[in-house]
Amino acid sequence: APIYMCHPAVFGRVSELATRDDLPVAMHLAGSREEYYFVKRGSSSFSVHGESVRRGFIEIPPWLPTGVSPVRYALNWGAFESPNVLAIHCVHTDEEDVKKLKEYNVAIAVCPRCNAQLGMGVAPVDEFMRAGLRVGIGTDSPAATDSTDMLSEMRLGMLIQRAVNVGRFLDSESMLEMATIGGARAPKLDDELGSLEIGKRPDHHPAQN
């Protein structure tokens, strides 16, 4: 669930259980501008605008606003304490957020078609990769995109990154890596799958020229 739908104490408790039982954790984080402003300022289209007109859909909880970004909000409540955390989206992040994600070895799953279709923005993939984060590409769900077609996700993701990062854009080789071994590294499964190597589980997808 998005972090603004959860009591912040849930983050630390999930981390405790995940650490104890050696479980991975996946969380939607910093996906939209509305989420960013709701967490940081307590104001966005997610909140209730006035007592007489209810245009939002979430009451402002007593622990908001926090004055910090969604990444640092999650960090402050212990969301990154378990050893295998995957943050989905991470569109609205700044330099300090990226440093913290790296410090806590949090992996990133970017979902370009979902982000484009819902008007969420563009994830700073180039910054993630330069920081040495584990980055994979995901399709989100059919509720947010037209399909879960990975090849379509890769193509649109590459084109969007080329459009916003002129001169430092993502090439097809990097995108293929994100979709294969990068996607396996993100949840720490790269010793089992993600590349065609002896001892790994084969996972083939036929492609037609």
Task: Cite the ranges covered by each PLM segment.
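Redox-cofactor binding/interface segments in oxidoreductases and associated redox assembly factors
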Residues: 109-110, 207
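His/Asp/Glu-enriched, well-ordered alpha-helical/loop segment
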Residues: 76-82, 126-209
